[in-house]
Amino acid sequence: MAKELIFGHQNPDTDAIGTAIAYSYLQNKLGYDTEAVALGEANDETKYALNKFGFTAPRVIKTASNEVDAVMLVDHNEPQQSVSDIDKVKVTHVVDHHRIMNFNTADPLYYRAAPVGCTSTIMWQMYNEKEIEIPQDIAGIMLSAIISDTLLLKSPTTTDQDKEAVVSLANIAGVDYKEYGLKMLKAGTNIADKSEEDLIDLDAKSFELNGSNVRVAQINVVDLPEALERKDAFLKAMDEASKREGYDMFMLLITNILDSDSEALVVGSDESKAKFEKAFNAKLSDSEVKLPGVVSRKKQVVPPLTNAFEA
Amino acid sequence: MAKELIFGHQNPDTDAIGTAIAYSYLQNKLGYDTEAVALGEANDETKYALNKFGFTAPRVIKTASNEVDAVMLVDHNEPQQSVSDIDKVKVTHVVDHHRIMNFNTADPLYYRAAPVGCTSTIMWQMYNEKEIEIPQDIAGIMLSAIISDTLLLKSPTTTDQDKEAVVSLANIAGVDYKEYGLKMLKAGTNIADKSEEDLIDLDAKSFELNGSNVRVAQINVVDLPEALERKDAFLKAMDEASKREGYDMFMLLITNILDSDSEALVVGSDESKAKFEKAFNAKLSDSEVKLPGVVSRKKQVVPPLTNAFEA
């Protein structure tokens, strides 16, 4: 069987990288020949998790078709979030927990999606269904992915299935998930030694909303005032990125992981900003607005933006 | 929990109707409130199977949004094969074995697809994963769906998983699958008492191929010469349907289920016919051509047509 690459989305987070590693292990057990790779460097949080469970970061690729004819996707399906030459390879498998958008294939494929908090929760179910034993390190990296995506089970995307998976995986991994989880999340909140350009690209995704190219970035912090001291520099970096990449709107969600509140910074045309304000029923003041309780891009940001841009 | 409708594609076959019934039973066991319906009348083969296992044909609906806010799809995902107001309801679940095309959602959903011969094979796996006991009549209708889609496991779409499912389901249903299967398939081959207009619409699907609207219909027979005596009337009906519905090409695949060969009739522009000939590397003679061994629209017709229309 020809080798296939498995990867998550661009600007990978712990789910994108952790679930790729877990899926590759599972598929290889089932007779496939796969390698988990990544579409970017691991962030600090992911590095902490990889290190904790004894993994090295997956190799970073820029294109896939120079290596393989077929790939498997985790934690994404939208082509603009995938490898740059996704149209030149065949997608044979997808495991994801996002909406399906602009994902078209010529042939039938394996597709497994569920509206749960993390792709690793689906992966945990797949291991159980296939009755493949989960090694301790794989359990640890899947646990880390779920903690990351659900902000320690506090995000509104969290389902009972995520909670079950966390308890089961923490048991196999041999860690106290609350204690470990908070350490891991905090490892991802050190923004002091990173430039604004880097911070707005660490966990950023593009969405085509009714013809508009909308960028939504998110950073996790434990000290919101510290982050907002750099507001002008953030806005400048977002403005420059928008001009360079052609974004119609750029939104940065700065989330305090300790109290699950966020502050949003927004740059874009007056028309885009009006749509943003409509989406969240909130007025921007000097490009900034509080979004109390908003922590999930997928569940609390993209749907209202989609509705506002389509109205 | 609000009621949801479950249905397969337009011009329903035994998979579309049988798997909808089986999925509704499974989901209701899991706590959902669902009803299996159909987007058209059951054909003769499906009626035979429904009758054999004690089911009445599901209620036929033309629209969904007048009844429910949310639906579950089986055996299709492409919007033009679905209910006419699919854009007005939320799709919460899909179980399918086709390519994914033009299927976009605003929110995450349950999506389960695999490149196997029949949707009921995936459904059988889902019952097993959820450890829900399959009643005898549900096993019978799922068995019928797999026999129908795989032409008694002889279609090139057939996988080992389909074969396993057939053996397991036949055992639960208490039938000899070969004997029953041939009787069921033959029940669908009586074309004598149907008009050409009806026959070209019984099992027909539309595909958008690079901007062209291509219709592919299939009928199963046991006596190919009998069917070809009506060739001129078939061509006339296909031509009229094309003008009425705006098809750029209409292809009718007449398949002899006993020897797994087909004869194709084709109407359309010279340009479309040239693409057809390129797709199958075969010359049409008086709008007709033999396609030896071709029995699967999904695996042996749509992919070569897609390639030819996109070249």
UniProtKB/Swiss-Prot annotation, chains A, B:
Protein name, as recorded: Probable manganese-dependent inorganic pyrophosphatase
Binding of Mn(2+) 1, residues: 9, 13, 75
Similarity comment: family membership: Belongs to the PPase class C family.
Organism: Lactobacillus johnsonii (strain CNCM I-12250 / La1 / NCC 533)
Signal in keyword set: no
rRNA-binding in keyword set: no
Keywords: Cytoplasm, Hydrolase, Manganese, Metal-binding
Positions annotated to bind Mn(2+) 2: 15, 75, 97, 149
Cofactor dependency: Mn(2+)
Upper lineage: Bacteria, Bacillati, Bacillota, Bacilli, Lactobacillales
NCBIfam families in the cross-refs: PRK05427.1
Catalysed reactions listed for this entry: diphosphate + H2O = 2 phosphate + H(+)
Record localization: Cytoplasm
